[in-house]
C-alpha cells in the first residue's frame, strides 16, 4: 500500500481541522434543530427508547440499558454525557414538559448529582411519544449510523413545537443558544394563528404567546425585552422569585420564597442569602431556612421586628440570585446552518417541517391503502367464483403453480394471487364477503380523503391544525410564570444594607482616616490615637455607620465616602490613607472633613481660598452615587488653594484674616447659592502680596488666636471685629513695624470647645493653654512664645 504524503503548513492544517471540528460540534452536539427542538444526543436517546419499546405504557427499564443502546447504536461517546442528557430530559425544573419519566434519584434543583444509571429506571413520557409519532410512516429521512449497521432519523416528526415549549441552552464554537421554555397551549395557539395568517405580526402573536413560561415559575419583567427577542432573536428580561410575607406568632415577619428564577441553584441561593446575613451586608435578617419538602419549594427568611421587609427584599433582589437577568439568544440549526431566529421564523420553520411530515405520512398511508384496495378487490372477485378457484387450486401441483394458474386463467395479479392462496378456509363465508365489501367502501373513502389532502394545501394545513388542537387539549397546563410589563426599579434603603452602629470617625492632618468602635475609643482616650511622626489629629467625632463622610482637599475637590466603607481600626492603630480609598494627587492635602446624616437639608458649605475667593453651595448638591474618584466641590483657579471649608445650618458671621494682619467680618447672607463648578466671588480686597490665612465662622462669645512667624501669639475678642460688607479691605489687627514686621502664619476662631494650642516651628513644637494667652487690643503684636533664634520661625498653629 503506497503512502500519500502532503506537504502542508501547520497554519493551514490547524485552520482546516478546527473548521471541521467546529462544524461538527455546531451541527452534531451543542445546538438544537429548529424543527424538533432537539440536539443530536437527545434525539438519539428518545429514538433508542422508542425503537426498543420503552414507551409510557410499558414498565420502567434500567437507565443503563438505554445508555448502552444509545452508545452502541447511535452515539459513540462517553456514557456519562449520554446519561447526563437523559437525566436532564427527566428534570421538571429544567424542562417545561419532561420527555422522559424517571424512577429514582434524578438530581435536584440544588444541583445534586443523580444516582448512578444502574440504579435509576426510565421510560418515555406520553408527550415525548408525540415527537416520535408516525416516525415509522416514512415521515422523516433516515441516515446510516456511525458504523453503517443501522439507520437513525435526521430529525423527529415532532408533532408539537418542542423548541419553544422546552427551550434549549448550549455553547459551541462561535455560537451559543439560550431559548427559554414556553407554555405548550400558548405556543400551539400562536402556531394555529400563524397557519391562519402567515403575515401575522409579532405584536399579534404576543396576544397568544405571552412570553416564556419557566418550569420553576417566577415573575418575568419587561415586555419590551420579550418583544425584542421575538423580533430579532436577542433580548433581555428580568426574572425574579415569587416572595410572599408571613407574620409569625412572636410578631416577627418572614419572607417566604416559593418560586425561584430559572436554572438558579436553590442551595447556592440559600447559602448566598445567609452569607449576606452573616457578613452583615444586610441588617434585619435573623435566620435563613430551606424548608423545601415534597409539597414544594419553600425558603423562609426570618426578619427582625420593625424592619422594612420591602427594602430587605429589594436588597436581596439586587445582591443575590433572587432576581436574575435572562438573555434570549435564539440560535438553532436551520437548513443545516446555525441561525439567530425570531419567533415568526421558528414557527415558520416548524410549520414547513410539519407540512413535509404530514405530506409524507399521507403518501405512505395512501400507498398502503391503494395496495390493500387492490388485494380486497382480488379477494372479492375470488369469492364471487369461489368453486372455480377452489377447483383450480386443488388441481395445482403446489402453491407456486396455484398462483400462476390464478394469474393465467382468471387474470389475478401477483399480489392478489398471493392473498388468495394464503386465504384460510374459515374466511370463505358469507360474513367475510360482507366484511370485505365494507372494507372496500372504507378504503375508497380513505383513498379519496388522502388524495384530497395531498392535492389541497388548505386541507393539509387543516390536518396539522386538528392534530395540534388534539395535543393542546390533551397536554395543556396553566401558566407558571407571571409576566409584568415593566422592569421594576430596585430601591434600597441604606438602613437595610448597613447595620446602624455609633462609631468614632477620625481624620489626621496628613490624611489618615478610620472609624473606631466606641469601646476601643473609650479604652484608649483621645491622646493615644495612632499617628505617624509629625502628624496630628484634624478632627474626630461620633458618627453612625449609615452616615456619609465628605473629605475636602486644597484642590477644591471632595471625596464621598460612606462611613461603613471605612476600615474599622482600633484607636491606637494608624488609620488608612484616604488615597487608598479614593485616589488623590500627590500634592493634594485634606483641609476638612464633615459628616452628613441626611442630604435633604437646608444646610450649606462655604469655601474660601488663599487668594480671597469665596463661595456658598447647599448640602444636597454634594450627594452622589460615585465613590471611586474625587468630585468637584468648587473651582480653584491656578496658583490658588482652597484653605477653608465651613458648614452652617443657617446664615451667620464669618471672619477673614490675612497674612499682613487685615481682618474682614460679614454675614454669609451676602453670598448667593452657587453650583459646584463655580469659582465664587471676591471675599476680601487684598493688598499687594497679601493672602488669606483664615476664613471661619464666628460668634460674639468667641475669641480669635493668631500666630506670627516671629513666634508671637495674639488673642482678641469678638468686639474688636467690625461687621462690614463683603469684598472690603477690613481692619488692621497688627502694629506695623518697619523692620522685620509681624506676619500672621495661622489663625483660628476659639470657641468653648478649645483649650490648647500647638505652635510648629521648623525644629520645635510648643504646647500651651489658650486661656494663658491674655486678650490684646487691636493694634498690638501679641506676646512672644517661641524663641525663633533657637527654633526658627513659626510656620503653623493648631488648636484643640
From Swiss-Prot:
> Looking at the keywords, is NADP present?
no
- Family of the protein in this entry: Belongs to the type II topoisomerase GyrA/ParC subunit family. ParC type 2 subfamily.
The protein's name = DNA topoisomerase 4 subunit A
Top EC category: isomerase
Query: What's the name of its gene?
Result: parC
Presence of the UniProt keyword Ion transport in the record:
no
Q: Which InterPro entries match?
A: GyrA/parC_rep, Gyrase/topoIV_suA_C, Topo_IIA-like_dom_sf, Topo_IIA_A/C_ab, Topo_IIA_A_a_sf, Topo_IIA_dom_A, TopoIV_A_Gpos, Type_II_DNA_Topoisomerases
**Where does the Topo IIA-type catalytic domain lie?**
31-495
Instruction: Spell out the reaction equation it catalyses.
Output: ATP-dependent breakage, passage and rejoining of double-stranded DNA
Q: Which cysteines are joined by disulfide bonds?
A: none
Q: Please give the NCBIfam families that the UniProt record associates with this protein.
A: parC_Gpos, PRK05561.1
In its UniProt record, which GO terms are filed under biological process?
chromosome segregation; DNA topological change
Q: Where is this site: Interaction with DNA?
A: 39, 75, 77, 88, 94
Identify the CDD domains for this entry.
Answer: TOP4c
Q: Where is this site: Transition state stabilizer?
A: 118
Where do the catalytic residues lie?
119
